[in-house]
Amino acid sequence: MYKRQVFTAEEAKAVANRLGYPVLVRPSYVLGGQGMQIAISDKDIVEFMEIINRQVQEHPILVDKYLMGKEIEVDAVCDGEDILIPGIMEHIERAGIHSGDSISVYPAQSISQKIVDMLEDYTIKLARALHVKGLINIQFIVYNDQVYVIEVNPRSSRTVPYISKVTGIPIVKLATQVIIGNTIKGLGYTPGLQKKADYIAIKMPVFSFEKIRGADISLGPEMKSTGECLGIAETFNEALYKAFIGAGIRLPKHKNMIITVKDEDKQDIIPIARRFEALGYRIYATLGTAKVLKENGIKVIRTNKLEQPAPNLMDLILGHKIDVVIDTPPQGVEHQKDGFVIRRNAIETGVNVLTSLDTAEALATSLENTDLNNLSLIDIATIARR
């Protein structure tokens, strides 16, 4: 990825304009994505630089080109020569949302064999080049049928327990053995990417926003989840459904939802809204979103924005009439105030709030063709041995 180190707002603006917006602005060393921001204008750069410099002193700040692609994650074990890759994990949310806050799917469902081969090849080359003995974690972006490296971590990651559990490969034990001199082949394993499972395992982030007053629930580069859960099934839909339930997504009572999305998402929301309509949802939307949905044959009830007379969005939310809010915040700091009020009040009222179209699409998928009264039971202790 294209990257530059800067120290001042003027330097950051120059790099951002050379790379082209949007860009990712972040401290040179962070944990959990702390201080990371996506900037879409010079105004954002100035504000973000002030925030970062208040938190991190005397360290360079990185400005990267931001690519809206498919994020992929790989954990592997390297003995210095051979590399074992238990599996490839695909994030449902596009790049820009912290990996710890993204829904992760094993095995990856939407990438081609060509991309799989590239991911395996890059993982092997990177592990060897870095002389890794033990665990390595690599995060990739697939963008326009090309693979880019986001970051390489020569260590364990939060996905290690997940990928070990769902593949049955004890990669922590293997990493420990290779660190003390054993080899992957000597431990009885074939190097390379292992055969993918015939079931779907989904890692779902768990949030505690209702307990953290004043926290904005919109997702971005900074990690906000406080836990995770696992959904396993033989179909993608059912695995998603189990994961959503495990994460605390409440089942609909009224089948009423609010949709309010940024301008860039108005065309992409159309097929998603159509799917929820087919599931029996009544859709409320503000003027701009309602106009687009209505023009595309979707039944929608127009409602007023916060600053407009009642009944408006807040009346619907506080009246306990809404099950789901889909609200995609516009990028940039100057646009976020009204959306924050909507999201905060919704979460405090017990309403499910989704701030990514990818998550909203996943929720629709989980409700389609899933027999809610006949969910399968999966034995996690034996399924990976099949």
Predicted regions and their residues:
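Conserved beta-strand termini and adjacent loop/short-helix elements that scaffold enzyme active sites
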Residues: 6, 64-66, 286, 303
